[in-house]
Each structure stands twice: as C-alpha cells, then as structure tokens.
Amino acid sequence: MAVPDTQEFRQVVGLLPTGVTVVTAFSGDGPAGATASAVCSLSLEPMMMLVCLDRGSRTLHAVEEAGRFGINVLGLDQRNAAEVFATKVPLEEKWQSVAWIRHLEVPIIEGCPAYIVCGLH
C-alpha cells in the first residue's frame, strides 16, 4: 500500500462530515478566534469539550492566556464567518466582519444557533 502524501490526506479528511465552529477567547491584544472542525464532546460527567488548535495559533495563545474560551457553532448562513476565521488576516479584520458580544468574558459571535463557554483544564 502506497503512503499518501499530505495533499491527498488533506483531501480525504476534508470529506469527513463535521460541524463548523469558531473557537474564541480574549487575550491582552483583544478578541481572537479560529475556525475549527476538530471539536467534540469529551465527557458528560463532568461536562467537557475537546478542541484541537494549531500549536502556533494566536487563538491557542489567547485560550491559554484567558483560561477560558467559547465554541461558536456556526449556522448555515454563517459561511463568511467560517471562511474569515480560517484565514491568517489581521484579527481586527476578522472581528470587523462579524457581529459579536462579550459573554462570560468570552467573545461570542451573534446569530450562532448555539455556543458553549468553557474553562481550560
């Protein structure tokens, strides 16, 4: 069996059905956020979520700094938010492209069908 290259692997895993979320947190520089599809429930007792972020991500840095984060579950009409938060554009541009509020010290994107505010463990 041939070993797939990274491009082939990316194409295949991109076909896996999953919800789309934006993980958000505040840092000293303001709100940070990144599109994440590697998000799942980890436990019901206690209630825990698992989120996978790139080690070099500004959002991961913000999550670690804040000790809390939001998981914004995007709706069908929020494709623009998914695309903007998946890019490396300046944070100010990302946050100017969506309406958001501060809730429980976490940035929450308005219009999401659901969101979860989490503490870091």
What are these regions (language model features)?
Residues 1-121:
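Active-site-proximal mixed secondary-structure blocks
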